[in-house]
């Protein structure tokens, strides 16, 4: 019987070829790592939440009671809650009732959480000084857009957040 014997051998890899391959691989990893956030920035976020929305929760994850909320807060207060996708979201109290909208508390400039300033009746970003009116409309600073709106409805004794549908009433 005849055996087929292959005399093919790979040529030995020189140091130069090995170092070039390692350097190219390293540069490729760095370039891909640097491009990922850039590409992610240009892809719009999904709407999040479901059609039914999400019950607003306090910092401990307990549903917020509307009756308790209105009894313990001023008639024009803004109360921080966990909103859609876990983002900090303000429940807006206007004239002693829960408004039909809430405000995402994340600054549109660089993503800081914007606290409500009761004394000045506005939101002030501690990072770069952006200021927002009581309805979330940007009034000063580097922030490019107003705070994002979410729909807020009273469901029994709870506040339910859902994605905002329709035009921004603050722009009219």
UniProtKB/Swiss-Prot annotation:
Disulphide-bonded residues: 112-127
Reactions catalysed: 2 oxidized [plastocyanin] + a plastoquinol + 2 H(+)(in) = 2 reduced [plastocyanin] + a plastoquinone + 4 H(+)(out)
Compartments reported by the entry: Cellular thylakoid membrane
EC annotation from Swiss-Prot or TrEMBL: 7.1.1.6
Keywords per UniProt: 2Fe-2S, Disulfide bond, Electron transport, Iron, Iron-sulfur, Membrane, Metal-binding, Thylakoid, Translocase, Transmembrane, Transmembrane helix, Transport
Chain sites annotated for binding [2Fe-2S] cluster: 107, 109, 125, 128
GO term, biological process aspect, one: photosynthesis
Source species, domain of life: Bacteria
GO molecular function terms listed in the Swiss-Prot or TrEMBL record: 2 iron, 2 sulfur cluster binding; electron transporter, transferring electrons within cytochrome b6/f complex of photosystem II activity; metal ion binding; monooxygenase activity; oxidoreductase activity, acting on paired donors, with incorporation or reduction of molecular oxygen; plastoquinol--plastocyanin reductase activity
Gene3D superfamilies assigned: Rieske [2Fe-2S] iron-sulphur domain, Single helix bin
First-tier enzyme category under EC: translocase
Gene Ontology CC terms, in alphabetical order: plasma membrane-derived thylakoid membrane
Membrane topology listed for this record: Single-pass membrane protein
Record text on cofactor binding: Binds 1 [2Fe-2S] cluster per subunit.
Main localization of the protein described in the UniProt heading: membrane
Cofactor: [2Fe-2S] cluster
Segments traversing the membrane: 19-39
InterPro entries membership: Cyt_b6_f_Rieske (IPR023960), Rieske_2Fe-2S (IPR017941), Rieske_2Fe-2S_sf (IPR036922), Rieske_Fe-S_prot (IPR014349), Rieske_Fe-S_prot_C (IPR005805)
Function: Component of the cytochrome b6-f complex, which mediates electron transfer between photosystem II (PSII) and photosystem I (PSI), cyclic electron flow around PSI, and state transitions.
Any further remark recorded for this protein: The Rieske iron-sulfur protein is a high potential 2Fe-2S protein.
Subunit: The 4 large subunits of the cytochrome b6-f complex are cytochrome b6, subunit IV (17 kDa polypeptide, PetD), cytochrome f and the Rieske protein, while the 4 small subunits are PetG, PetL, PetM and PetN. The complex functions as a dimer.
Record-stated family: Belongs to the Rieske iron-sulfur protein family.
The protein's name in its UniProt record: Cytochrome b6-f complex iron-sulfur subunit
Biological source species: Synechococcus sp. (strain JA-2-3B'a(2-13))
Annotated gene: petC
């Amino acid at each position: 019987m005849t055996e087929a014997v292959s005399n093919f051998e790979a040529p030995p890899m020189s140091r130069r070829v090995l170092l070039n391959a390692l350097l190219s691989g390293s540069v490729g990893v760095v370039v891909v790592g640097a491009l990922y956030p850039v590409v992610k920035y240009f892809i719009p976020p999904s709407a999040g939440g479901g059609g039914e929305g999400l019950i607003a929760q306090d910092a401990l994850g307990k549903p917020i009671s509307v009756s308790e909320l209105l009894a313990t807060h001023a008639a024009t207060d803004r109360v921080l809650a966990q909103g859609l996708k876990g983002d900090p979201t303000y429940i807006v109290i206007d004239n002693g009732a829960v408004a039909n909208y809430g405000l995402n508390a994340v600054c549109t400039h660089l993503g800081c959480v914007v606290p409500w300033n009761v004394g000045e009746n506005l939101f002030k970003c501690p990072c770069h000084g952006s200021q927002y009116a009581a309805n979330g409309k940007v009034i000063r600073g580097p922030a490019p857009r107003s705070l994002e709106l979410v729909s807020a409805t009273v469901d029994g004794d709870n506040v339910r957040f859902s994605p905002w549908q329709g035009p921004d009433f603050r722009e009219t």
